[in-house]
Regions:
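Fe(II)/2-oxoglutarate oxygenase catalytic core
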Residues: 1-153, 161-193
Length: 193
């Protein structure tokens, strides 16, 4: 990566035994946040796929925003896990006064032969610290800047509609954990025919 586009120190923790507990804690926190996000924006889950769920009468019913919002976590979680999956988690450090990701970008693009980057549906960031100036996540079309607050979770669509950048922190380093929420691969989603 060119430093004028992105200047950070990154480590991927996914699949590394020494980071397994941290990865599990981050994924659990993000999943809790995702359930709340889906209740607020139910079409995130139901617009891409016409989902059906069994009703109390045993018949299958289309999953509507109202049905989704009424589900408790125990009902909603298996549906979400059937459709979506976590991405590889990166820890990133942006050095104060120098680091950042000033290039306007989105998270959905063709890159690898398996099309993993094209399966990205949502992005997420957990801010691991604060106490520095600027360093916001800025969304171009929404004309919005999200100020980092330690422990807060940001979830947003991965597509160009949420083109964003990471502004340079001032007066201190910025640390984040970040990844994506991806669709399951079609082979898995449609394995039953």
């Amino acid at each position: 990566m060119l430093p004028e586009l992105k200047d950070s120190a990154d480590i991927s923790i996914s699949g590394r035994p020494e980071w397994r507990d941290v990865e599990a804690q981050l994924n659990a926190a993000v999943f809790r946040g995702l359930l709340a996000y889906l209740r607020r924006y139910p079409h995130t889950l139901i617009a891409p796929l016409m989902l059906e769920v069994p009703g109390k009468d045993g018949a299958r019913h289309r999953l509507t925003p109202e049905r989704l919002r009424a589900m408790d976590d125990a009902e909603l979680s298996p549906i979400v896990q059937t459709v979506l999956r976590p991405g590889a988690i990166n820890l990133q450090r942006y050095t104060g006064g120098r680091g950042g990701y000033p290039y306007w970008h989105c998270e959905l693009y063709p890159r690898d032969a398996h099309g993993e980057t094209l399966h990205r549906h949502l992005l997420w960031t957990i801010y691991l610290n604060d106490g520095f100036g600027e360093g916001e996540t800025e969304f171009l079309y929404q004309q919005r800047k999200i100020a980092p607050r330690a422990g807060s979770l940001l979830i947003a669509p991965a597509a160009f509609t949420h083109t964003h950048r990471g502004n340079r922190p001032q007066g201190g380093d910025k640390f984040i954990a970040t990844s994506w929420i991806l669709f399951q691969r079609a082979e898995r989603l449609y394995a039953g025919g």
